[in-house]
């Protein structure tokens, strides 16, 4: 509770700061004025004492001087303001830091709203290239003596050949690759959009994308390319079948890349779009609401497509045991809801001055009136009324817990609080705050009216003060009203597959206000036997002020319910109710403002606001589910790649970052690991699983194409001669493992049994450790002489570690430093290690040419509601669920 009390004082501190700043401005302006006067005096004295003669010509100079003085004073005041602004900003930053320390996942409100609204369906971005892991590259050929030939040869190599630094596990590379594919995985491919002209075509044909065109270009220009292939490239063009709405494009792809792109083409998420789908996309309650007039554009083309949003419910149950995460989600929902709740502007409310004047007359305030009655009018203004209206609806929409702020001696606040507790379900208030407010109402108004002793409430009592009072009060009307409040809960109703928290029908139609008024009338008629006459009169007048506005209160209750339920129709995630870590403060004086200033003007959300709210909710919910699917897929992949323990926290952190609204470093670790456990239980989505299986089946090909991943290492006690290789020159590389004793690296890491390997090495038998591991390339002859590869031997025999194993591949050829040492002296270089690596796949043009098929054309629409034109009836005619006007009191 300590930090809540600090929060209460914050406003006072801010006011003090503002006053101090004002004083500083005054002091600074005084100082600057004094400085100016001193400067002027100094200038005058200089002029008098100086012996120089001055010729005075005209008055224009004086005018210029005056202008300059004005300019300088303006500049000084600007500088002052800037200094003060920076001070204010600094103070805000300090307060923000203090707040961050108390709230685990706190984010500034404006940025949350922007982040929420910026979440767009990823489908909107067009895919302008095919997905590729490999690219063909020209590599030189070396002669037997290590000199480079003029000829080249084409091989398939990796486009992005990057490995995590300082890590044995090449499997991390595959996990990162999979993560990258999940990010880039297109929801649809329209080849017509990405097709580019084939420069070497005879008849202006097109190929599938720019990379295919550049590969064709490079091969066409290569001197060693056969004439048949050149003629084939010249004939490469698209084939259109207009009657079937199909087009075929030629592409140059590695077989694995072809498998990926074929999969993407055959598993597109686009679906045909028609008017019925758009009609059903609009929430049913808004479609059926007679206050909104919806018209639809009927001119949708047959090629229209859309991507169905992924709106699965409660897969992680973040409301259950994720206090910090749930607090952030409800906060962001609250800020979004506040931005869409309609404003009660001054013209929609009763004039504040006129209302206060009327209240003063009703109170018959005179000079001798007791202090408590003058408090009734304190803090009543239209801004507070509007703030209260927005807070109540937004808190219910986001299921944010509210806490009440009030002064016990202000009876008017407490009487307004009676209306608040009648209309808003108990669950919405912080338990301690609810108990304090109920206790104040009981001990200030209810018990004194009947002459009962003060209630002494025990902290931690399972019953609330109203529940205790309901059993003790004999008066039927008051007990009946207390009974209603004690049982005022949200009703959970599933509408269109979404769990909604709905209000009691008596609240929706405003009839509960009559029940409240009956109880208030009964209380005002009581004698208050143990209290002085002034006390009784104050309470009676407070009740009179509220009862005079019976009609307006009924209308206000109906208006509140209607706005809540209409906006609730746009919520797509289940409305789970759990008390939140932090609360939204609500001043009871602002509730009084709302009760006293509500007019007879109906305010309902505009259709554009509803559509905006619905779109933001759909986009967030869909993104949330897609990111869950990504995280579940990555966790499964990490498990199957034996990286399970290592990567888990970073996977969950990435998942939260991609949801946009979380301040991830502040999420407690226990919630991270609980989130991991929940994600682990979910099934992997089919597309993502198929993609991972494609990677798993082709790991060998990917390793072969990399310049940083070896497929094993051979270690010997004695030196082995470097061999000649066409791709590298002289190199310590093994293309096969025939004749070597083999040990699996994964087995060695898991068992930790190094006995077998050390015995073999000490008996002068070479050992081949088989498994993917990183290697480094060195082309320095000097370092080969220095035998740096001894470190590999030491890792195994002495340190008994393979997790940091990084063998060196020596490449000695005409491109190497000091190659003349080998060439001139017929020196035969040796090494105690050999890197096992198979030859990368040679590039064969005929085998790499694939025809890809897709629809000739279709148009994907992301904003379905843009086809709907909407309008509202005149607000005065707007009706509620019972077919009666929302506001009856005219």
UniProtKB/Swiss-Prot annotation:
Residues 1-88 are annotated as: 5-fold hub. GO terms for cellular component: T=2 icosahedral viral capsid; viral inner capsid; viral nucleocapsid. Belongs to the rotavirus VP2 family. Inner capsid protein that self-assembles to form an icosahedral capsid with a T=2 symmetry, which consists of 120 copies of VP2, with channels at each of its five-fold vertices. This capsid constitutes the innermost concentric layer of the viral mature particle. It encapsidates the polymerase VP1, the capping enzyme VP3 and the genomic dsRNA, thereby defining the core. Sumoylated with SUMO1 and SUMO2. Sumoylation of viral proteins seems to have a positive role on viral replication. Homodecamer; each decamer is made up of two conformers of VP2, called VP2A and VP2B. Interacts with a VP1-VP3 complex. Interacts with the intermediate capsid protein VP6. Interacts with NSP5. Interacts (via N-terminus) with NSP2. The N-terminus binds RNA. It is necessary for encapsidation of VP1 and VP3. The N-termini of 10 VP2 molecules form a cylindrical hub underneath each 5-fold axis of the inner capsid. Residues 1-45 are annotated as: Disordered. Residues 28-42 have a biased composition (Polar residues). The record marks 232, 236, 849, 851 as: Interaction with the intermediate capsid protein VP6. GO terms for molecular function: RNA binding. It comes from Rotavirus A (isolate RVA/Human/United States/WI61/1983/G9P1A[8]) (RV-A). Residues 404-424, 432-452 are annotated as: Hydrophobic. It is found in: Virion. This is Inner capsid protein VP2. Keywords: Capsid protein, Inner capsid protein, Repeat, RNA-binding, T=2 icosahedral capsid protein, Ubl conjugation, Virion.
């Amino acid at each position: 509770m300590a930090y809540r009390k600090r929060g209460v004082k914050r406003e006072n501190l801010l006011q003090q700061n503002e006053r101090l700043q004002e004083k500083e401005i005054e002091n600074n302006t005084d100082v600057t004025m004094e400085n100016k006067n001193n400067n002027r005096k100094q200038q005058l004295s200089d002029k008098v004492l100086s012996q120089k003669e001055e010729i005075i010509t005209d008055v224009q100079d004086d005018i210029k001087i005056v202008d300059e003085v004005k300019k300088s004073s303006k500049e000084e005041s600007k500088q002052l303001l800037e200094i003060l602004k920076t001070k204010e900003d600094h103070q805000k930053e300090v307060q923000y830091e203090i707040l961050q320390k108390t709230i685990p996942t706190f984010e500034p409100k404006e940025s949350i709203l922007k982040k929420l609204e910026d979440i767009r369906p990823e489908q909107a971005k067009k895919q302008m290239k095919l997905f590729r892991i490999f690219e063909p590259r020209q590599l030189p050929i070396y002669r037997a003596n290590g000199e480079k030939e003029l000829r080249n040869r084409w091989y398939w190599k990796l486009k992005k050949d990057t490995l995590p630094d300082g890590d044995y596990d090449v499997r991390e590379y595959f996990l990162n690759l999979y993560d990258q594919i999940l990010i880039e995985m297109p929801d649809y491919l329209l080849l017509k959009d990405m097709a580019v002209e084939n420069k070497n075509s005879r008849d202006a044909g097109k190929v599938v994308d720019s990379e295919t065109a550049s590969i064709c270009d490079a091969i066409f220009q290569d001197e060693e390319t056969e004439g048949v292939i050149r003629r084939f490239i010249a004939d490469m063009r698209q084939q259109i079948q207009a009657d079937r709405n199909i087009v075929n494009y030629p592409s140059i792809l590695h077989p694995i890349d072809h498998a990926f792109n074929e999969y993407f083409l055959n598993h597109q998420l686009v679906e045909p779009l028609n008017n019925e789908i758009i009609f059903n996309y609009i929430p049913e309650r808004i479609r059926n609401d007679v206050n909104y007039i919806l018209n639809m554009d009927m001119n949708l083309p047959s090629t229209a497509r859309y991507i169905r949003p992924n709106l699965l419910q409660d897969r992680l149950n973040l409301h259950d045991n994720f206090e910090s995460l749930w607090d952030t989600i409800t906060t962001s929902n609250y800020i979004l809801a506040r931005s869409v709740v309609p404003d009660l502007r001054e013209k929609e409310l009763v004039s504040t001055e006129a209302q206060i004047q009327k209240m003063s007359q009703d109170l018959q305030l005179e000079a001798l009136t007791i202090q408590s009655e003058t408090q009734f009018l304190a803090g009543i203004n239209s801004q507070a009324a509007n703030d209260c209206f927005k807070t109540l609806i937004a808190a219910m929409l986001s299921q944010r817990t509210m806490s009440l702020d009030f002064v016990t001696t202000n009876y008017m606040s407490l009487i307004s609080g009676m209306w608040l507790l009648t209309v808003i379900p108990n669950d919405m208030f912080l338990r301690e705050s609810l108990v304090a407010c109920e206790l104040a109402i009981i001990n200030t108004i209810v018990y004194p009216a009947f002459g009962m002793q003060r209630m002494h409430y025990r902290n931690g009592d399972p019953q609330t003060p109203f529940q205790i009072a309901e059993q003790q009060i004999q008066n039927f009307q008051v007990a009946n009203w207390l009974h209603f409040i004690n049982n005022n809960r949200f009703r959970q109703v599933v509408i269109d597959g979404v769990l909604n928290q709905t209000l009691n029908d008596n609240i929706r139609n405003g009839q509960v206000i009559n029940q409240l008024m009956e109880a208030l009338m009964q209380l005002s008629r009581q004698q208050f036997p143990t209290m002085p006459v002034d006390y009784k009169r104050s309470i009676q007048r407070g009740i009179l002020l509220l009862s005079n506005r019976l009609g307006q209160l009924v209308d206000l209750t109906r208006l509140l319910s209607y706005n809540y339920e209409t906006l609730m129709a746009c919520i797509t995630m289940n409305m789970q109710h759990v008390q939140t870590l932090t609360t939204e403060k609500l001043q009871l004086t602002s509730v009084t403002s709302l009760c006293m200033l509500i007019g007879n003007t109906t305010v309902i959300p505009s259709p554009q606001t509803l559509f905006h709210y619905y779109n933001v909710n759909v986009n967030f919910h869909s993104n949330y589910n897609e990111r869950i699917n990504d995280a579940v897929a990555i966790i499964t992949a990490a498990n199957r790649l034996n990286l399970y323990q290592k990567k888990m926290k970073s996977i969950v952190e990435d998942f939260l970052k991609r949801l946009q609204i979380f301040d991830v470093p502040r999420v407690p670790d226990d919630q991270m690991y609980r989130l991991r456990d929940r994600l682990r239980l979910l099934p992997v989505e089919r597309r993502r699983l198929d993609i991972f299986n494609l990677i798993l089946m082709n790991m060998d090909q990917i390793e072969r194409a990399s310049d940083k991943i070896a497929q094993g290492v051979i270690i010997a006690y004695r030196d082995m001669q470097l061999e000649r290789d066409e791709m590298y020159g002289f190199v310590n590389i093994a293309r096969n493992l025939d004749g070597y004793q083999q040990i699996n690296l994964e087995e060695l890491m898991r068992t930790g049994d190094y006995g077998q390997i050390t015995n073999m090495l000490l008996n002068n038998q070479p050992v081949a450790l088989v498994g993917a591991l990183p290697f480094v390339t060195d082309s320095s002859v000097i370092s080969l002489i220095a035998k740096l590869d001894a470190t590999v031997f030491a890792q195994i025999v002495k340190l008994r570690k393979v997790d940091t194993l990084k063998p060196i591949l020596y490449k000695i050829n005409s491109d190497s430093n000091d190659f003349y040492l080998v060439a001139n002296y017929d020196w035969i270089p040796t090494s105690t290690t050999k890197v096992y690596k198979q030859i990368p796949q040679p590039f064969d043009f005929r085998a790499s040419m694939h025809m890809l098929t897709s629809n000739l054309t279709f148009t994907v629409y992301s904003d379905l509601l843009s086809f709907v034109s909407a309008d509202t009836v005149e607000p005065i005619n707007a009706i509620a669920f019972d077919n009666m006007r929302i506001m009856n009191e005219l």
